[in-house]
Amino acid sequence: SRAAPPPGRMERHGGGMSPLVVIDYAHTPDALEKVLVAMRPAVADGRELVCVFGCGGDRDPGKRPVMGRVAARLADRVVVTTDNPRFEDPAAIAGAVAKGIVETGQRRWLLELDRAAAIAAAVHAAKPGDVVVVAGKGHETYQEVAGERRPFSDARVVDEALAGRSPA
């Protein structure tokens, strides 16, 4: 038997009559590429791989457009959102990510700075057979904003969004 991955690493939610949502801590270009490549075979024929992610503030700004390019190249749709903006402007962080997406010519992307709304929108728009990867925070139970740790759980938001989906 296979051991379950640790919380926040390839953590699966939904599937079956709902889209499969995978939460992963991937927060570097290499890690994001690996999780998207790993999940591509799970996408049903004719369905889509969706990537929801953001980049942390007060961290390497050079990786932001690179991560945008990785997501745009490997996912069918991309939703750019916040991660832990810390003391940086969330819109500026997302703008740097978006620059990388735009450079690829990918047109199927959107920007939603409210992480819960971004995750919910991606889950609600997804169909059975789609795979939604929610990357960047994984097991974290908070979001760091302006020196404050606010309670936040990707898993809770994903489960609430899946529970609130209309039947396919």
For each of these PLM feature ranges, what is it?
Residues S1-A168:
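ATP-dependent carboxylate-amine ligase
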